[in-house]
């Protein structure tokens, strides 16, 4: 019987970037850190210039003849590229509607679990459908279900705002939450804003009569 093939569980080797001493081309077209052209120079000269500037020599176009390099801060460049990739991924995220289900008699532990689920969905940029399920005669307790949903909205108010208030839908009561776009202004912040607004109100002009001194006897 032929031996079974073994899978290589080692982590894949990442391709190292072509920078500095890893660049092997003898002649390079070099762009300086400010965008100016240094022209076609030798690899050694390009490395010397990058060292003088305390920057990196980065290969940006290997297929050009001769290959094109740019002098830059590679660490900063890599950070900005990763940041742009994350922002692009965030923008491409398709908003979904996630559902959190519960009964109106939910205990505190299960309630905390549902709050945690909703927080994760909201953090991912998704809307949350909060559903209270009624069984049998439980449909008589819609008022308690609405209280529960309002409580959930209050507990999530720092991350979410109500898109649709609690309402009956068949044998369920539902409420929709959407990720909060503007930060919630807390009471202390509101008071501070009010006091600041009061301080910026100009004082009323003094009356002319008050400025005229009373005649001396």
UniProtKB/Swiss-Prot annotation:
PROSITE patterns xrefs: IF3 (PS00938)
Biological process, per Gene Ontology: ribosome disassembly
Classification via SUPFAM superfamilies: Translation initiation factor IF3, C-terminal domain, Translation initiation factor IF3, N-terminal domain
UniProt KW keywords: Cytoplasm, Initiation factor, Protein biosynthesis
GO annotation, cellular component aspect: cytosol; membrane
Localization, UniProt: Cytoplasm
GO MF terms, alphabetically ordered: ribosome binding; translation initiation factor activity
Alphabetical list of PANTHER family matching this protein: TRANSLATION INITIATION FACTOR IF-3 (PTHR10938), TRANSLATION INITIATION FACTOR IF-3, MITOCHONDRIAL (PTHR10938:SF0)
Assigned protein family: Belongs to the IF-3 family.
Subunit comment: Monomer.
Function (record text): IF-3 binds to the 30S ribosomal subunit and shifts the equilibrium between 70S ribosomes and their 50S and 30S subunits in favor of the free subunits, thus enhancing the availability of 30S subunits on which protein synthesis initiation begins.
Name of the protein in its database record: Translation initiation factor IF-3
Organism, as annotated: Synechococcus sp. (strain CC9902)
